[in-house]
């Protein structure tokens, strides 16, 4: 597990998520026993999910089914230790602004040097900012 300043990366992500004002709770959903134990070890809350999910979206759907009373779930990837807590709040606020919204994803303008980076996910949107498709290439 990657360490940053002596702490696991997932702990930094967890702490950033806890700094956001809107979430009532922060839970790490994982299919990895080591991640689960690490989160519990630093006092965080974690749940184990199925290892058979083909994507993170499927994992998130499992979490949503297990927490039917929760209105909004914000998905933060475990490799985002520098995520500004304000981003989490902005995403959560989108659901307050549009009551019929079912899913939202944050996007940012891409730096020119990332255009040809296959690890950088690109999104194509319509004129209203709604995603048409995502691409990692």
Model-identified regions with their sequence ranges:
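N-terminal glycine-rich phosphate-binding loop and ensuing alpha1 helix
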Residues: 1-29
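Short, flexible helix/strand-to-coil boundary loops that buttress conserved ligand/catalytic motifs
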Residues: 21, 39, 135
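Short phosphate-binding loop-to-helix
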Residues: 27, 33-76, 80-93
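Short, high-confidence coil segments that cap the C-terminus of an alpha-helix
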Residues: 23, 69-70, 98-101
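Conserved core of the sugar-phosphate nucleotidyltransferase
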Residues: 83-137
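Active-site donor-binding loop signature of nucleotide-sugar glycosyltransferases
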Residues: 6, 51, 78, 125, ...
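ATP/adenylate-binding site constellation spanning eukaryotic-like Ser/Thr protein kinases
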Residues: 6, 32, 128
């Amino acid at each position: 597990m990657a360490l940053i300043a002596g702490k696991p990366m997932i702990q930094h992500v967890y702490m950033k998520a806890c700094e956001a004002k809107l979430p009532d709770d922060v839970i790490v959903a994982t299919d990895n026993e080591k991640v689960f134990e690490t989160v519990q070890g630093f006092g965080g809350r974690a749940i184990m999910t199925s290892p058979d999910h083909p994507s993170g979206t499927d994992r998130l759907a499992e979490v949503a089914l297990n927490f039917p009373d929760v209105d909004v779930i914000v998905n933060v990837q475990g490799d985002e230790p520098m995520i500004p807590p304000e981003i989490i709040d902005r995403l959560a606020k989108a659901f307050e602004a549009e009551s019929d919204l079912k899913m939202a994803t944050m996007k940012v303008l891409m730096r020119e040097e990332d255009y040809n980076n296959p690890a950088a996910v690109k999104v194509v949107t319509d004129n209203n900012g709604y995603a048409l498709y995502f691409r990692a290439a």
